[in-house]
From Swiss-Prot:
Any single GO CC term annotated in Swiss-Prot or TrEMBL for this entry: extracellular region
Disulfide bridge partners, by residue number: C47-C53
Predominant location category: secreted
Positions of the propeptide removed during maturation: 16-41, 54-55
Subcellular location(s) of the protein: Secreted
Keywords, comma-separated and alphabetical: Amphibian defense peptide, Disulfide bond, Secreted, Signal
Keyword Disulfide bond recorded: yes
Protein name (Swiss-Prot/TrEMBL): Riparin-1.4
GO biological process: defense response
This protein's record includes keyword Signal: yes
Tissue: Expressed by the skin glands.
Cleavable signal peptide: 1-15
Domain of life: Eukaryota
Length: 55
């Protein structure tokens, strides 16, 4: 059963990578957008964009 869980996690991770790479290719004309910004956009909660997170 653990193998199934590992495969599911790998599929989710690869799907996120595909989303990031697709967004990166779609915005290739904008040099301002880096892969780090895209990762933040996908993985950070919405409050991070507004600066209201309590860290």
């Amino acid at each position: 059963m653990k193998i199934i869980v590992v495969l599911a996690v790998l599929m989710l991770v690869s799907a996120q990578v595909c989303l990031v790479s697709a967004a990166e290719m779609g915005h290739s004309s904008d040099n301002e957008l880096s892969s780090r910004d895209l990762v933040k956009r996908f993985f950070l909660p919405p409050c991070a964009y507004k600066g209201t997170c309590n860290h």
